[in-house]
Amino acid sequence: MSFDAKAFLATLTELPGVYRMLDIGGNVLYVGKAKNLKKRVASYFRENLSSPRIAHMVSQIASIETTATRTEAEALLLENNLIKSLAPRYNILFRDDKSYPYIVLSKGKFPRLGFFRGNPDRKADYFGPYPSSWAVRDSIHLMQKMFRLRTCEDTVFSNRSRPCLLYQIKRCSGPCVGFISADDYAADIQLAAMFLLGKQQEVTRRLTKSMEEASAKLAFEQAAVFRDQIQSLHQVQEKQFVSSSKGEDVDVLVAIKEAGQLCVNLAMVRGGRHLGDRPFFPTNAADSEPSDACAAFIRQHYAAHPAPARILSYPLPSEDEAGETEVALAELAGRPVPVQEGRGATHKAWVEMAIQNARLAILAKNQATAQQEQRLAALQDALQLPEPIARIECFDISHTMGEATVASCVVYEGNRMKKSDYRRFNIRDIQAGDDYAAMRQAVSRRYDSIAGGEGTAPDLILIDGGKGQVSSAFSALADLGLTHLPMIGVAKGEERKPGLETLIFPEGREPLQLPPQHPALHLIQEIRDEAHRFAITGHRAQRGKARKTSKLESLPGIGPARRKALVARFGGLPGVLAASIDQLAEVPGVSREMAEKIHSALH
């Protein structure tokens, strides 16, 4: 039974909202937002649709669900949440869940210059966001050189008796030991903030004036400091290929389609300074146009991140799309956020730079893909596997003398590490330090669902270990009836140096040692090292948690609320152990009698 569009449209409201198109199986094909639900949904049922991709989607529609909202901003936020959670087949999807980094200047008598990632609050001054952590750290390095601000943590700052190395190399003015007054340090902080806001000319003017005043007072050492700051500032300005004297906050967005890839590149300009860019390669975009990708990126990105004063887009979204999006962005930001093409020499230069960097990103991605495919082909050939390798899973075990044993399983798929499929296993009910039993348990728990017909089986299993670990892992597969899954162990050489690994096979096949430069070995090392990293971070967290709470959890009469209060008061088990009975009795919910019992049980 075909979808009756005419009857459905007659029931639609003209309010803003979100629509979801579903196929006959109830799968969501597409999620969209609209200023006018009735008008937007009706546009899909015109005779001449602009895109074959959209026409194919419309032919599969069995039903449409709608949600009316009060404003276009609400519709934008709801659309973004649904796209991220449902991942519809016909939506261009951008994975941009990472928060962007900022430069932060803390409050206080001697503020700290630092790196921040997260949601800014009012406890400090934030500058950014920046497209990458590298861009922030590079800017912090420049700020240290120009303004000599401290970057040490407050705990270090308050306990120093002599200046650190940064003072010796003229990257800090030494406020920790009183080598600069609070007033002079505050002046440097003000100049740094002005620089980050794009007021370089004003910073230069003030430094020049200070240098001249110091020279007039014959304070030549101080004048030399100002001179060096001015020179550093000029060097920074020379490195900035294209900057704006207007101190603008602009995002430059370009989308290009070349060499089988669609890349959306976001360049960030803050305070007139070009801070760098970040390329995105969306999924479900093979048949999409660059203008559609720009429109999708604007909706998804700025529903989750603050919008700048202006967005330059190349190419521009359609006129209707751009207009609706501008209204929604203005509601979210509380001010107009124009989406426009580059106008003027500076804006056009920014767009050209973003296009060039998008092309470089496509080239780099295709080269990386070709390299990974070469590695996979070399691995298939080296192991004499009949089928191409698409998915690899690798196991590793981590513990400290048998304490807090954790197994990791990392996944390589689609020419990259697939972190969404990673798993950790807290190993229990084995003899402490028994790596073989730990490996057997981890493999058994991971593939139990595969034996039951659920999930995705790997094309190759890597075991970080030698004959014993491989034998234990293979035994677990045998119990599950999965011995057809290819498996190898990666045994380190006697000197435990990369390139000397030996590949161990189950069931008696001769071990294999690949040359150090073999591409298959490089791939194995990359995956093995990631499994080790994932295992050891999980182990450390588990060990720290166990050491912090294990004895507290075994105390009679101490439930979760009291345990939480004790940890909050004393910072963990060591603090509780060091506390006296009187100090324990001061904790909310702990009586004198209970404090005596706790103290007695712990000592």
From Swiss-Prot:
It is found in: Cytoplasm. Residues 14-92 form the GIY-YIG domain. One of its GO terms (cellular component) is cytoplasm. Gene3D superfamilies: 5' to 3' exonuclease, C-terminal subdomain, GIY-YIG endonuclease, UVR domain, UvrC, RNAse H endonuclease domain. It comes from the Bacteria. Keywords: Cytoplasm, DNA damage, DNA excision, DNA repair, Excision nuclease, SOS response. Residues 201-236 form the UVR domain. The keyword Isomerase does not apply. Pfam families: GIY-YIG, HHH_5, UVR, UvrC_RNaseH, UvrC_RNaseH_dom. The keyword DNA damage applies. GO terms for molecular function: DNA binding; excinuclease ABC activity. GO terms for biological process: nucleotide-excision repair; SOS response. Belongs to the UvrC family. The UvrABC repair system catalyzes the recognition and processing of DNA lesions. UvrC both incises the 5' and 3' sides of the lesion. The N-terminal half is responsible for the 3' incision and the C-terminal half is responsible for the 5' incision. Interacts with UvrB in an incision complex. PANTHER family: UVRABC SYSTEM PROTEIN C, UVRC/OXIDOREDUCTASE. This is UvrABC system protein C. It comes from Dechloromonas aromatica (strain RCB).
